[in-house]
Amino acid sequence: MDSDQLPAAQNAEGSQSSEVDSGAMRLDSAPTDPVAAWFRQFTPYVHAHRGRTFVIAFGGEAVADPGFPGLVHDIALLHGLGIRLVLVHGARPQIEERLAMRGAEMRYVNGLRITDAPALASVKDAAGATRLEIEALLSLGLANSPMAGVQIPVASGNFVVARPLGVLDGVDYGHTGAVRRIDQKSLRARLDQGAVALIPPVGYSPTGEVFNLAAADVARSTAIALGADKLIFLVEGEGLQDAQGRPITHLLPGDIEDLLAAQGTPPMSEDLSAALRAGLDACRSGIPRVHLICRRRDGALLRELFTRDGAGVLITDRPLEEPRAARLSDVPGILSLLEPLEQGGVLVKRSRERLEIEVNHFQIIERDGTVIACAALYPFPEDGMAEMGCLAVHPSYRRGGRGDRLLKHVESLARAQGIGRLFVLTTQTAHWFRERGFEPASPAALPMAKQALYNYRRNSQVYIKTL
């Protein structure tokens, strides 16, 4: 059985409470309007994202897709919500189409195009036409359309200073280049004026040359130069899976290195590999969150940005949902986990004031600012013992080992305080604790101070674990 699927709840004794499953009881309430509920879930993210800078990268495949106008509508919504946007687009299929029309050779080495003079002409043509197509969609304002009444200024320019890639491993890449720097001052000025910045996959040198660039590298360099809050890649594939075939939703830098080093079956697509490499570098360069989202899924961009569980892969430089000490500001979230059980009589009712006094005993796991699990540690140092209480997990998050993580975290805290034994009181979850090394004991084995508070009517079972 999964560690977070606790079948019932531990009882509270005296002034302290113990293990509960916050989904153990469902209390009747007035039906919730689904539209109102959606707005309530959506609103905190609106406030969190307003005024932030997001760099969004997508390939030329997205632009060529008949569904691209829908993605543009979603991007326009982000702008309307006060998010500062930089769009970086690719143009590979558009370039290849023009090369084919001209009968020119298409040559790639290590995923990079060899850009000779004929290829550069196709790059310029395709990049310019693709940029104009995106600008036209962002300018759409027809009545009875999602863009009705919307006016979005679009800024393009020579924001990217580039250099030639040169000769690598004996291969002359011609007019293929690399980003030298981003004119972040000019770019910031356009964003400050309320414009959406649109950057094609080309760069310019101080000598007036034009270079063909990889869109992922342009996006990465732009995000780093601006100190963006998010770097978002809209990729072609359906995402990543672990060895058991489960979707991967979060990656750390080390995880990405392992993925890139492994020989995937089937092999990883070029755009996904490029996005992972760029995301890894951006993460290590201070970008707090990098997102990989399948652009083919309708609404995936909005779901990733405005729901707690998202719709893609999140890259961060530190683990998500790390247990931490609760703060006073976490009290409302802890109450939301415990109140249903208190109302149902599973736990002893506690006031907000009392929880505020005891909050220093609590450890929590949060997700996007929402407390999704909690536990408390009440030491009895004179007896070398401590009680673990209030181990509760949000009903939507019981399949991720969060109960085990909190238990291990609390055990570690107890050891650090010189505690040798940890005890719990329960009526219905004894097997869960037995599986994790707790042994049955009698109330007489409890610290004297706890024995004085023991409720014999509830007749909770006592379980003790030697640390």
Role assignments for model-derived ranges:
Residues 100-198:
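Ligand-binding beta-strand-loop-alpha-helix segment within the catalytic cores
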Residues 349-393:
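A conserved beta-strand-loop-helix scaffold within acyl/acetyltransferase catalytic domains
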Residues 412-427:
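Conserved GNAT acetyl-CoA-binding A-motif
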